Structures are given as structure tokens and as C-alpha cells.
Amino acid sequence: MSSAHERPDPTQRSSPTRPVAKRSDGDEIQERYLRRAIGEINELGDELLALGDELHVPVLGSGHPLGDVFLLKHHPTQSEIHEGVAFFGRSGQALLKSLQRLGVDPLAVYGTNCLKFGTEEPAQARAWLTRELHIVQPRLVVAMGEPTVAFLGELEFPLSEALDAERPGELQRFTPTIDAMVTPDIDESLDEQGAKTRFWAAFKTLGTWWAELPPY
């Protein structure tokens, strides 16, 4: 679920036999947005790490800081807490396989938990998640599980509408610029075949949404 943003080596000279492509204004603006998002995500991560200790380890979001898709579940698992990274372990592997099956670029995805420690006050967690949503500015939020849907509803995010947890796999409107869809909790959908089927039936809507996304 991690992202890789490769930049050209500034010490590498351009070949004299090839014209150097001029960067467009749009590219430069996008680069500035990305640098700012990386800085803000890192700042949030530093704040969370400063609040942690040996017994309370924050689980930081992972993926592209300007991801089109924002994967969200309620609380971290032990494997995530051990590594300090959201969606580390079985859930992340299951989601990666699902994204690949649907043709969704994993590098366009950001994933996090509502609760960063699993033990913090809800008001703290709501403030941190609100910051993440403002930084990433996703086009689609995938809310995994009813507790996640309820938590989103408590954010009072600007111009947001309440999501219906009883409509799994349907596109809903979260804000005028952010779509949303509800799925079962991925952590509870890894073992029993019926649970796997229910998660996939809802999650595969992401593939249709992604295919219809304008390429610009």
C-alpha cells in the first residue's frame, strides 16, 4: 500500500541528441500540490509519533498522499500496530490483489484507520482523520464496516452527507467533490467464504468507478 514517487536525478545530464520536454504549468502545479501534501502528511505523522510510547504505537496512513481512492477502516489490527503502518498484513495483501483484479492503480490509493492508536479519545481521532481528508483530497472514500460509516458521520466534514451503511457497493455522495461507497469490514472478511464473497460483491464497484474516471 505504500507509494513510490520517483524524481529524475538532478545530477544526470540530458542527452544532447534528445530534446528536453518542457514541463507544463499543470505539471508544476501538481508537483507543488504533491510536495505540500507530503509535508503535511509527514507533519501529522510526526505529531502522532510524538504522542506514542512503548505501549501506545500510532498506526500511520500509507499510500499516495494525493490518492484518488481513500480506503478507510475503523481501527488497527495487531499486525498494523506492530509495524505502525495502516493495512499492513493480511488486509493489505487482500486489498492489493483486489485492486489488481479490478485494474485500479495501487499507487493512486491512500489507506488509513479512523483510530490511529485504537485507544485514543474519539474527538482526537476525528480531528486527525479530518486533517487526512483535507490533505489527500480524494475523489472516492471507501468506508469499510458500519463503525467506520458511523465515525465518518460524526466528523461533521464540510458539506458532507451521511452515508447509508445499508447500501453496500452503491456509490453515494459524501461531499460535492467526494464520492463514497460502503463495504463490509475487510478485517472481518478474510477467513469465512461468505464474508469474502460479501466484501468482494461490494468492493468491486470500485473497478467500475475507476474505469469511468476521466484520465485527466
Residue ranges and their predicted role:
Residues 2-216:
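A polyanion-binding, active-site-adjacent surface
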